């Protein structure tokens, strides 16, 4: 929708936006273990969330279809290992039983899957899809800010 409404891409070409995001997400996930071993979970959360926020900013602020596609690649790569790192951190922390921690993370994740699209749609309807995307970028910056606490 963003590519057709904001970047003038035809509906037939707009599928490339999701395709490049999904390919980047898949490649990032397949290489995630190596990246986590090399950088550590804390840095993956920090760099991943910053990469995804930057990708959304590029997609929104640079008014070309090519830039939007590059932005979606950055979002895919950046987000690809955030959830696995959070699950790992939940399973290895000692403040609560691992099963309860993983259940809490799962509940939060499913809540986001259910509420997130509706909230993005609400903001897009009230303002613009670009503003909604920048709101998501802001939330990703909060993830970056809290990465030192989320993974110890």
Name what the model sees in each region.
Residues 1-13:
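Short amphipathic helix-loop junctions that connect adjacent transmembrane helices
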Residues 11-19, 99, 103:
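Small-residue hotspots at the loop-to-helix junctions and early N-terminal turns
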Residues 22-23, 27, 110-112:
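Short hydrophobic/small-residue motifs within alpha-helical transmembrane segments
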Residues 28-40, 124:
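Helix-to-loop junctions at the C-terminal end of transmembrane segments
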Residues 43-58:
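Structural signature of the two symmetry-related core transmembrane helices
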Residues 55, 66-74:
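Paired small-residue
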Residues 80-94:
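Intracellular juxtamembrane helix-capping segments at the cytosolic ends
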Residues 121-140:
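A membrane-interface helix-boundary motif in multi-pass transporters
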């Amino acid at each position: 929708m963003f590519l057709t409404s904001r970047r003038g891409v035809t509906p037939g070409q707009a599928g490339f936006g999701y395709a490049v995001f999904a390919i980047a997400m898949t490649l990032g996930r397949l290489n995630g273990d190596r990246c986590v071993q090399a950088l550590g979970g804390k840095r993956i959360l920090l760099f991943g969330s910053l990469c995804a926020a930057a990708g959304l900013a590029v997609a929104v602020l640079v008014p070309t279809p090519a830039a939007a596609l590059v932005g979606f690649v950055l979002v895919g790569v950046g987000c690809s290992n955030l959830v696995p790192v959070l699950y790992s951190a939940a399973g290895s922390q000692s403040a609560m039983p691992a099963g309860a921690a993983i259940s809490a993370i799962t509940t939060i994740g499913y809540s986001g899957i259910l509420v997130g699209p509706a909230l993005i749609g609400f903001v897009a309807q009230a303002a613009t899809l670009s503003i909604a995307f920048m709101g998501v970028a802001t939330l990703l910056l909060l993830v970056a800010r809290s990465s030192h606490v989320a993974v110890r």
